[in-house]
Amino acid sequence: MTLLDGKALSAKIKEELKEKNQFLKSKGIESCLAVILVGDNPASQTYVKSKAKACEECGIKSLVYHLNENITQNELLALINTLNHDDSVHGILVQLPLPDHICKDLILESIISSKDVDGFHPINVGYLNLGLESGFLPCTPLGVMKLLKAYEIDLEGKDAVIIGASNIVGRPMATMLLNAGATVSVCHIKTKDLSLYTRQADLIIVAAGCVNLLRSDMVKEGVIVVDVGINRLESGKIVGDVDFEEVSKKSSYITPVPGGVGPMTIAMLLENTVKSAKNRLN
């Protein structure tokens, strides 16, 4: 069994981005990511701090807009519009979730696609579905693909199962795997017999937010397992969606949690931001 070490790979990517940023600065461009946080969700605050720290580590300027939970939708849209027209800002990220009175889809669609470094704008989703690399790809699925590529895992012809059909991970992940030549099945909350799919799979990507959802009796020998789940137990321990101790015994490759997909997600956010800044140079 080989651990897919996202922490080590993300550190390498950050070093490469640091060099790219030095080049951009020599051309008068400072990569800049604007992050908007609405309210005081503790988990969201932690994520925003980690993103700001990661930006600092590789030479990206980070702007954090921490807004009151009672901000109106129009006020938030006005801020995004200002950032859309600010040439010094190359990436805009709105930290989810948003308060109930704000329409998430409307907010995400208001970010100009050329600064949508999360890859959620319909234009970028369209590029992905057409198999084009013109836009920005969603960070978590992109991070998974980079991780698999780094370990020279050939996806062509593999039977891949994705557990979870969200617009953030499951659906774009399915499209990326399809574009890479895999045969893809997407399982979700309505799937009647999950094991029927997972037992045949060469590659399983789990992104459901459910502790121990994937167990050893549900996988075949030699399976490749990518655990996107992040769950905090009552003890405070962070675990994924996979019964790691048992499933790892049958796996050829598996990601740990933490230290697998999480660091890669942030690395891809940084990479997309630098890509946007480089586009400005071109």
Curated annotation (Swiss-Prot):
Annotated GO biological processes are: L-histidine biosynthetic process; methionine biosynthetic process; purine nucleotide biosynthetic process; tetrahydrofolate interconversion
What Gene3D superfamilies does this protein's entry cite? Leucine Dehydrogenase, chain A, domain 1, NAD(P)-binding Rossmann-like Domain
Q: In which pathway does it act?
A: One-carbon metabolism; tetrahydrofolate interconversion
Molecular function per GO: methenyltetrahydrofolate cyclohydrolase activity; methylenetetrahydrofolate dehydrogenase (NADP+) activity
Q: Which EC numbers characterise this protein's activity in its record?
A: 1.5.1.5, 3.5.4.9
| UniProt binding sites for NADP(+) | 164-166, 189, 230
* CDD domains named among the record's database cross-references: NAD_bind_m-THF_DH_Cyclohyd
Q: Which residues form a coiled coil?
A: none
GO cellular component terms given for this protein: cytosol
Family classification: Belongs to the tetrahydrofolate dehydrogenase/cyclohydrolase family.
Say what the protein does: Catalyzes the oxidation of 5,10-methylenetetrahydrofolate to 5,10-methenyltetrahydrofolate and then the hydrolysis of 5,10-methenyltetrahydrofolate to 10-formyltetrahydrofolate.
Subunit structure of this chain's protein: Homodimer.
The entry's protein name is: Bifunctional protein FolD
Q: What is the lineage of its organism?
A: Bacteria, Pseudomonadati, Campylobacterota, Epsilonproteobacteria, Campylobacterales
Chain's gene name: folD
